[in-house]
């Protein structure tokens, strides 16, 4: 069992050391200005937050994350900015957005490199670990609870809906036959054994979509995103901007329609901004990133002022 100091080492060094995706596009998209107040709703290790704070003088930033490890890393990364930064531990959907308080809001969705590369968090089948997948470790529901307790139909439904897995019924049947499962590798092996060889040895591991579905369900990710999209625009000042980075089609669809359907927002990106080939070569995580940006409309009666 790792000591507290060993865990801290992994948080501070292994972590959140990955490069922020679409860095210049985010700063430009938010139109960061001197004296502005910005919200990073998914601060992670603080990579994007640092760019925002460095983009103009006297910038203030509120850094939100539901993961205690992330906040530990972000506090170290952003320590030099002192009282310019306020840290809040919260899921971005549960955060109490102050009305008309921010010049820009950023959300970088999905799982970080840290979560995938830290075995004890249980997000990846590349490492043997307990089936966990909780972003907020204060919550009770884990991936093991879903896999071992939900019935076959429920499992098939979530694999299809949230993982877009075509073999969802077949995989769910095998899981129910073989459970209980305790580790990520046990589950991944059962999934691989349930699919035809052409899928088993394909470029994408057959467990990939199932693990995505489990992560989404355990963390209620899509419902949280819907709530965030409803609440966040109210926190922007007129002319303030919201920038959201998504990593898979389910997220991007919600972001696209959420921004478009908000009566208080004007969408600035007809198509999502994606990484350049140079960035992808330098930071492979950016390959699937899509950035959408919208601007808060002026209040009624302010348009001509």
Curated annotation (Swiss-Prot):
Swiss-Prot/TrEMBL catalytic activity: cytidine(1402) in 16S rRNA + S-adenosyl-L-methionine = N(4)-methylcytidine(1402) in 16S rRNA + S-adenosyl-L-homocysteine + H(+)
Keywords per UniProt: Cytoplasm, Methyltransferase, rRNA processing, S-adenosyl-L-methionine, Transferase
InterPro entries in UniProt: RsmH, SAM-dep_MeTrfase_MraW_recog, SAM-dependent_MTases_sf
Any Gene Ontology biological process: rRNA base methylation
Residue sites binding S-adenosyl-L-methionine per the record: 46-48, 65, 92, 108, 115
Record-level GO cellular component terms: cytoplasm
Membrane recorded as keyword: no
Places the protein is found: Cytoplasm
Claim: Transferase is one of the keywords in the record: yes
This enzyme's EC code(s): 2.1.1.199
Enzyme class: transferase
Highest taxon in the source lineage: Bacteria
GO molecular function: rRNA (cytosine-N4-)-methyltransferase activity
A Pfam family hit: Methyltransf_5
Record-stated family: Belongs to the methyltransferase superfamily. RsmH family.
Function: Specifically methylates the N4 position of cytidine in position 1402 (C1402) of 16S rRNA.
Record-given protein name: Ribosomal RNA small subunit methyltransferase H
């Amino acid at each position: 069992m790792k000591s507290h100091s060993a865990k801290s080492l992994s948080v501070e060094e292994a972590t959140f050391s990955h490069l922020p995706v679409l860095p210049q596009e985010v700063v430009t998209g938010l139109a960061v200005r001197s004296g502005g107040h910005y919200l990073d709703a998914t601060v992670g290790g603080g990579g994007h937050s640092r760019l925002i704070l460095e983009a103009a003088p006297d910038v203030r930033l509120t850094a939100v994350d539901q993961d205690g490890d992330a906040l530990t890393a972000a506090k170290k990364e952003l320590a030099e900015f002192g009282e310019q930064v306020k840290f809040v531990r919260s899921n971005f959907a549960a955060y109490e957005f102050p009305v008309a308080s921010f010049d820009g809001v950023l959300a970088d969705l999905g799982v970080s490199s840290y979560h995938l590369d830290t075995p004890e968090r249980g997000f990846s089948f590349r490492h043997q670990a307990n089936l966990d997948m909780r972003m907020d470790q204060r919550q009770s529901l884990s991936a093991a609870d879903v896999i071992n307790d939900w019935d076959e139909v429920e499992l098939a439904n979530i694999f299809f809906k949230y993982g877009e897995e075509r073999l969802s019924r077949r995989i769910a049947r095998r899981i129910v036959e073989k459970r209980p499962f305790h580790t990520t590798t046990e589950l991944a092996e059962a999934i691989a054994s349930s699919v035809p060889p052409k899928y088993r040895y394909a470029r994408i591991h057959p467990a990939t979509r199932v693990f995505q579905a489990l992560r989404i369900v355990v963390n209620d990710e899509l419902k949280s995103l819907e709530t965030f999209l409803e609440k966040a625009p109210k926190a922007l000042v007129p002319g303030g901007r919201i920038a959201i980075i998504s990593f898979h089609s389910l997220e991007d669809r919600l972001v696209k329609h959420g921004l478009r359907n908000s009566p208080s927002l004007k969408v600035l990106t007809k198509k999502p901004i994606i990484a350049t080939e140079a960035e992808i070569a330098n930071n492979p995580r950016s390959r699937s990133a899509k950035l959408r940006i919208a601007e808060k409309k002026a209040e009624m009666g302010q348009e001509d002022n």
